[in-house]
């Protein structure tokens, strides 16, 4: 019998993630949507940085986590090469965290356009001016480029082709809550219905699992 209840209860990990994030937005002093995004470079070395989660889409069957960035940045190049990423969100005020691993795809251009248009004008110009992750002579050089582009692009710049969004489609989601004496609670959700695996099962005449996610309590 499962002892998964309280803040861990439910049959949709994306609903749980939304609930935790909403609670964190009421208790964290700033950037409750900050997440440490991990990728792997061409040499197999891990890389990590903080980015902002902008949406939790869908539900158990098709959910994803969305963020936006420069496609030509280090993280963009690494994601394009590997198609995978992981992230962790940790909230000190709640003493909880969420870990996610999965495959990554680009969001639709129309969605990226809409989000880009919602940003402050200076941020939109900055997306054009910054050659993210590449060497920069000085901050003065960057601000000069921002000023130049501010004049040439006007008040309604279009989205740069090198800037847009990514969706992380999880294969694993772990929910963690602090416990006394380091006896934490951890529940790992693992997606059990990979399309390739299901196709192989169907080809062999075997039954395809009906449960989309398998949930396992982990030792702290």
UniProtKB/Swiss-Prot annotation:
Disulfide bonds: none annotated. Keywords: Flavoprotein, FMN, Oxidoreductase, Pyridoxine biosynthesis. Binds 1 FMN per subunit. PROSITE patterns: PYRIDOX_OXIDASE (PS01064). Its cofactor is FMN. Homodimer. This is Pyridoxine/pyridoxamine 5'-phosphate oxidase. It comes from Paracoccus denitrificans (strain Pd 1222). The lineage of its organism: Bacteria, Pseudomonadati, Pseudomonadota, Alphaproteobacteria, Rhodobacterales. The gene is pdxH.
């Amino acid at each position: 019998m499962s002892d998964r209840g309280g803040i861990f209860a439910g049959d949709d990990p994306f609903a749980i993630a939304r609930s935790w994030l909403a609670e964190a937005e009421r208790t964290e002093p700033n950037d409750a949507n900050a997440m440490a995004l991990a990728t792997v470079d061409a040499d197999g070395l891990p890389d990590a940085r903080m980015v902002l989660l902008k949406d939790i889409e869908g539900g158990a069957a098709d959910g994803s986590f969305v963020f936006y960035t420069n496609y030509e940045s280090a993280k963009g190049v690494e994601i394009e090469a590997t198609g995978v990423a992981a992230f962790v969100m940790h909230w000190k005020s709640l003493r909880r965290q969420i870990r996610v691993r999965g495959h990554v795809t680009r969001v639709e251009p129309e969605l990226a356009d809409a989000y880009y248009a919602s940003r402050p004008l200076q941020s939109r110009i900055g997306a054009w001016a910054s050659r993210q992750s590449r060497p920069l002579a000085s901050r003065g050089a960057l601000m000069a480029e921002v000023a130049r582009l501010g004049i040439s692009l006007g008040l309604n710049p279009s989205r740069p082709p090198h800037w847009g969004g990514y969706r992380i489609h999880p294969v694993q989601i772990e929910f963690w809550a602090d416990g006394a004496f380091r006896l934490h609670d951890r529940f790992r959700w693992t997606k059990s219905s990979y399309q390739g695996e299901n196709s192989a099962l169907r080809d062999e005449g075997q039954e395809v699992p009906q449960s989309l996610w398998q949930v396992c309590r982990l030792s702290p």
